Amino acid sequence: NDYIPVIVPNDIDNESEYIDPRETALEIAEKMQADKLVYLSKYPGIYKDEERKDIYYKITVPEVEKLRKERNFPKEFDEIIGYGLQASKNGVNRVHILDGRIRHVLLIEFFSVNGAGTIFIETEAKLYLHELGK
């Protein structure tokens, strides 16, 4: 769509109504049928195991749903995963979860082979050629 909307938290302390930027970003991405939805968080991505040593760089929606049933993710992170799953099911091609504490994390994610966080997609058919090793 040639748009890059950026959604940020409320920045005025006297606002009486809280608007969740994660939920707002989800709704905008769904309405725009965005190619990508990016969440910056304090988590580096979805960990492969409970020891939190390695993260998935790419994972499918069914795999994320399975992990979500098997593990207890922190509440805030579980909400992000839930928004990402909803976006994926409602037409957003890719959801990226990135560690917002890393400098230049968006550049690293979009301009390197493995990226800097976890992306999840509906099916492996939506992977880019370089992600398939081709």
Locate each region found by the language model.
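C-terminal catalytic "cap/lid" subdomain
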Residues: N1-K134
